[in-house]
């Protein structure tokens, strides 16, 4: 059972996990682990399932998925019958009113919907993946020189599950470098997997870029793929100015993760998020929601 902190009620909600039986089998049983290493984590598995989700046959899955996970379609720009396939639904866009944004220069917003963890004063060689598990930022982006600039800074991990809005956005106005792609596996990013696969973020397919923000300095933006996420699509134009809240890109089907790194003393994350992280809980947030300040 995965408990998530609800900022509005100040209580814990139980996450409804898509494919829970499959995840438990793959990461906690001997046979499942063998199948995971031989097939599930490989590109071919995610590519095959991705092709299915791109086909018209997958359209039949949409209504059942919406009903099972109680997804509010009133926030979406399309009606159910307008989606061409499951990936079209999965990467759905929302109405502007669905995700209000605070445009104040000193306010930091969430880059997307998901479950947020915040780690301050980070050690580059021991960045927290999940409580009790760490990884190296240098290994994550394969660029020691860039990584060193974020020593002692702040790390935000935004975990998305399959039921979430899967587009990610810029947290401030500014310009962003071209994304660098790093090949890797396709492990799930569910906490069950994070507790069973060491340095998972460094093993999965990922992309990173440097966002030169107007108000929070240089931000290292990392997108991590996961099981069935065969594609991370960047929709922004490198080095072209963007406004706060503009779309940066999106993930195709599957759970996935966005990680942001801030340099030391450039940001202060809201205390409730930091405290919940210390207690071992993620905090549910939506894109555009205030999560910190200068």
Curated annotation (Swiss-Prot):
As recorded in UniProt, its EC number(s) are 4.1.1.65
Top-level taxon of origin: Bacteria
- Which GO CC terms are listed, alphabetically? plasma membrane
What cofactor is this protein dependent on?
pyruvate
Record InterPro entries: PS_Dcarbxylase, PSD-B, PSD_type2_pro
Q: According to its UniProt record, in which pathway does this protein act?
A: Phospholipid metabolism; phosphatidylethanolamine biosynthesis; phosphatidylethanolamine from CDP-diacylglycerol: step 2/2
Residue spans crossing the bilayer? none
Return the cofactor note field.
Binds 1 pyruvoyl group covalently per subunit.
Q: Where is this site: Cleavage (non-hydrolytic)?
A: 255-256
Q: Identify residues that carry Pyruvic acid (Ser).
A: 256
Give a GO molecular function annotation for the protein.
Answer: phosphatidylserine decarboxylase activity
Where it sits in the cell: the answer is: Cell membrane
State one Pfam family annotation: PS_Dcarbxylase
What is the protein's known function?
A: Catalyzes the formation of phosphatidylethanolamine (PtdEtn) from phosphatidylserine (PtdSer).
- UniProt xrefs under PANTHER family: PHOSPHATIDYLSERINE DECARBOXYLASE (PTHR10067), PHOSPHATIDYLSERINE DECARBOXYLASE PROENZYME 2 (PTHR10067:SF17)
Identify this protein by name. Phosphatidylserine decarboxylase proenzyme
The scientific name of the source species is Clostridium perfringens (strain 13 / Type A)
